[in-house]
Amino acid sequence: TTLVDAEQAREDTAALLAGHPDINVLVAFNEPTSVGAAQAVEELGLEEQVFLVGFDSNVATIEGLQTGSVDALVVQNPYAMGYLGVESAYRLLTGQAEELAPMVDTSTQIVYRSNLFSLDSQKALFAFG
């Protein structure tokens, strides 16, 4: 089941960490779970004990990178995903399937606190096409 509610992710993460104090790494695979997990880590004061990797980004997760509740973000490129997906669909519908690559890499950028303000990270976090 994929969680899409940050509050539920916060509650579940807090319960998981309380029940298993030996956990020192968390990976949250979408934006809402990244937000909720970061909130739980911060509320429990575990910024120094738990290494949290989140996917995608928003104001809350970027702030978490700055304050320490998030240690890394895997930032995808939704513009490229949408654009290249539509382009591929167009080629299929217009008989140009032979021009399609079997795999399309839309790129990701791993953003840490240490490279948060680099040009590449800023482009990934605030991409507009």
Describe each region flagged by the PLM.
Residues 1-12, 27-33, 56-59, 76-84:
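Hinge/beta->alpha junction and helix N-cap segments in small-molecule ligand-binding domains
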Residues 67-79:
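Short beta-strand elements at the ligand-binding edges of bilobed clamshell
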Residues 8-22:
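Short, well-structured alpha-helical segments in soluble
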Residues 19, 36-44, 64:
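Alpha-helical structural signal in soluble globular domains
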Residues 80-129:
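Hinge/cleft segment of the Venus flytrap/periplasmic-binding protein
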Residues 20-30, 49-55, 74:
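Periplasmic-binding protein-like
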Residues 49, 69-70, 107:
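A generic structural signal for alpha->beta connector loops
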